[in-house]
């Protein structure tokens, strides 16, 4: 009998053992995870982590998992009523993505020397918005992460919590620059790109 769990386990191990054929691994990964729940996939990944999978394999696994679900979300529209919590969550995620893109766009203008007062104000407004996103982070940390950990899923919350802290640190540095009014284009660009990239990847997890 075909065992999806064993197949996925072997597939994840191939990420490390057969790194030259990552595209084929991704294809197989996408095919099998579409037939499984996120909890099933996360449990298998956690089992492999518990077996002391090499750190580089864990990172590769996370990156491929992220790519797969990005592709899946871009291909499939989630058909639920507007009042459904899933619909609300997807819309919130899209809004965060759009704001992240706007932040990176503003950063690009600054790097190119096209800085205006409206750009500075717009970036300050975007930082205010990201301060509000902190509430969602706290919900995840206080409600979702403990729930996952109680069910034996330790690695996913640890990775997401680390990203929360990275975003907080970058956001704090960018806020200090904007509030002080001393704009260093290269530094603002690097911080903005960093925040945007982590935000964009984080919401797919």
What are these model-predicted stretches?
Residues 1-205:
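Small-residue-biased structural context
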């Amino acid at each position: 009998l075909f065992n999806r769990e064993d197949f996925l386990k072997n597939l994840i191990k191939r990420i490390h053992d057969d790194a030259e054929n990552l595209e084929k691994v991704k294809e197989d990964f996408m095919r099998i995870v579409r037939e499984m729940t996120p909890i099933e996939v996360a449990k298998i990944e956690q089992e492999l982590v518990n077996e002391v999978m090499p750190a580089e394999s864990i990172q590769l696994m996370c990156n491929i998992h992220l790519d797969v679900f990005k592709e899946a979300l871009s291909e499939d529209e989630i058909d639920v009523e507007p009042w459904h919590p899933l619909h609300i969550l997807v819309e919130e995620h899209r809004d965060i993505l759009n704001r992240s893109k706007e932040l990176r766009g503003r950063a690009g203008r600054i790097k190119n020397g096209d800085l205006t007062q409206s750009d500075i104000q717009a970036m300050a407004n975007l930082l205010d918005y990201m301060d509000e996103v902190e509430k969602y982070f706290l919900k995840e940390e206080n409600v979702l992460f403990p729930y996952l950990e109680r069910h034996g899923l330790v690695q996913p919350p640890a990775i997401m919590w680390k990203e929360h802290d990275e975003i907080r640190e970058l956001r704090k540095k960018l806020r200090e620059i904007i509030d002080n009014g001393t704009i260093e284009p290269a530094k603002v660009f690097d911080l903005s790109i960093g925040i945007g990239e982590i935000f964009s990847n984080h919401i797919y997890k």
